[in-house]
Amino acid sequence: MTEKILIREFIKDKNVGAVFSAGRNVIKKMLESIDFNKACLLVEYGPGKGVITTHLLERMRKDAVLFVFETNEMFVKELLNIRDERLVIINEDAYNAQTILKNRYKINKVDYVISTIPFTFFDRRKRKRVISKTYNLLNENGKFITYQYTGLIYQLIKQRFHQTRVMAAVLNIPPAIIFTGIK
C-alpha cells in the first residue's frame, strides 16, 4: 500500500490516526520491550497496513499467536496479504478486544498489547476505559506498549499500571513518544 492510500484513508476515516506509517526508530523502540522468547499471545490495536505487524511476526516464536484489531476495511484487505498462520485478523474495534478474545477464542489473558490507535481521538472516558480493559486483558507482568504524538495518555497509564516507561523517538517524523505500562 502506498503512502498515498494511507493519506486518503487518513482523510476519509476519522479513526485512522497517522498520515505516515511508524518509522524504524519507533518500531525498534517498541519491540525492545518485548521478550519474544516468552511471548505466546500478543494483541495489536490498530495495525493499519501492517508495518509493526510484520516486524512482530518476524520475531515471534513459531507457536505464538498475534491477534490484530483493525476497523478500517482498506487496511484489513492489506493485512490479509500477510501470509502467516500465527496472524489472526479481527475486523472489530480494539475497545471490544477483551470480550472478543474471551468469547470467540477462549482467551482470558495475553502477554503483550501493542497499540498505535490514536487515543487523542477518544474522549477521556473512552481513553480511560480502553486502558483499563487493556490492563485487565494482560497477564501478570504483561505489557501495554503504545506510541503517540502527545503525552495525553501518560497519566492514565501511570495510574493504572504498576510500572511505566517512557521513551522518545525523536528521529521519527513527527517525533513520537513510546509508553510502556507493565502490569
Where do the protein language model's features map onto the residues?
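Class I SAM-dependent methyltransferase Rossmann-like catalytic core
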Residues: 2-36
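Conserved class I S-adenosyl-L-methionine
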Residues: 39-48
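Glycine-rich SAM-binding Motif I of class I
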Residues: 50-54
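Conserved SAM/SAH-binding beta-strand->alpha-helix loop
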Residues: 72
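S-adenosyl-L-methionine
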Residues: 75-105
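A short glycine-rich, Lys/Arg-flanked "PGG" loop and its adjoining helix->strand segment in the class I
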Residues: 128-140
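Conserved beta-strand signature within the Rossmann-like core of class I S-adenosyl-L-methionine
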Residues: 140-148
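Core SAM-dependent methyltransferase catalytic element
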Residues: 168-183
